[in-house]
């Protein structure tokens, strides 16, 4: 469609290096249930590429960075061909680091229940997917990240984390000492206004952003559980769509990612429908 780019969906069906299980089952479930068709309904072309690693047996850390590199190449290729990359990933770090590298380091607007700001020195779980933002701003795994084509750390001030509400003590200390802007859950109706203010400040620094949607940003009670880590006090669908519209009104979106969807927790399909609405809001300008 003239004026609106075609979309390249980049599916990365892995959770901690393991294919097609837990959150790794999310990308294909979204595709099997009409995500691409919904995006095509506006008349734009939508192509689908699935990324697979060759590491056997998978090692979580090494595989994570291998997948990031594969995503980076796909994102770069899509942009070079005039397409909008939309990464569907089991894990956040794969979509985020790969997209940031492939898009040559735009700003970050990241929707997530969790801070993703631990490092190997602060984590109590060893879960690399709790370190995605820390990797993005150059706080950890620096040598491994150098191997991702196109990656350079993002300045902390160029990152906005939205609706974060499940943060470790060590993560909070790290946020307090950083330039990352953190917008918490909606309090007395001020959440969207606070996000709007944060986006306005970010707009004074960057024009191009990567938008990341971890589906556990959604309210576990009002919408449904996206995964085992889902929590209350999240966004409802209307808030999510309004927030994504705010982003599209202010920035050019270089790439977008949707992550952390475990279909086994979505027993009534409400998260699936919310994810589809989010994908449309991420990729379709309001004028479409």
Residues of each region from the PLM?
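Conserved alpha-helical scaffold segments that buttress catalytic/binding sites
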Residues: 2-288
């Amino acid at each position: 469609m003239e004026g609106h780019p075609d979309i390249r969906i980049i599916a990365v069906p892995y959770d901690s290096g393991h294919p097609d299980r837990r959150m790794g089952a999310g990308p294909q479930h979204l595709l099997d249930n009409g995500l691409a068709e919904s995006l095509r309904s506006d008349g734009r072309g939508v192509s689908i590429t699935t990324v697979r690693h060759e590491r056997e047996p998978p090692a979580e850390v090494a595989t994570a960075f291998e997948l990031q590199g594969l995503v980076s190449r796909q994102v770069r290729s899509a942009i070079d061909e005039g397409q909008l990359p939309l990464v569907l990933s089991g894990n956040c770090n794969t979509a985020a680091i790969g997209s940031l590298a492939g898009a040559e380091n735009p700003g970050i607007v990241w929707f997530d229940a969790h801070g993703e700001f631990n490092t190997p020195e602060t984590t109590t779980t060893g879960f690399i997917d709790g370190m995605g933002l820390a990797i993005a701003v150059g706080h950890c795994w620096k040598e491994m990240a150098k191997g991702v084509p196109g990656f350079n750390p993002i300045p902390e001030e160029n990152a906005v984390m939205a609706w974060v509400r499940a943060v470790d003590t060590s993560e909070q200390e790290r946020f307090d000492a950083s330039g990352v802007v953190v917008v918490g859950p909606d309090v007395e109706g001020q959440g969207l206004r606070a996000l709007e203010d944060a986006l306005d400040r970010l707009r004074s620094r960057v024009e191009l952003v990567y938008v990341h949607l971890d589906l556990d940003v959604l309210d576990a009670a009002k919408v449904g559980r996206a995964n085992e880590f889902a929590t209350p006090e999240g966004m409802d669908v209307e808030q999510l769509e309004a927030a994504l519209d705010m982003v599209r009104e202010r920035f050019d979106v270089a790439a977008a990612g949707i992550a952390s969807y475990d279909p086994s927790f979505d027993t009534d399909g409400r998260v699936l429908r919310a994810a589809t609405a989010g994908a449309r809001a991420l990729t379709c300008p309001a004028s479409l």
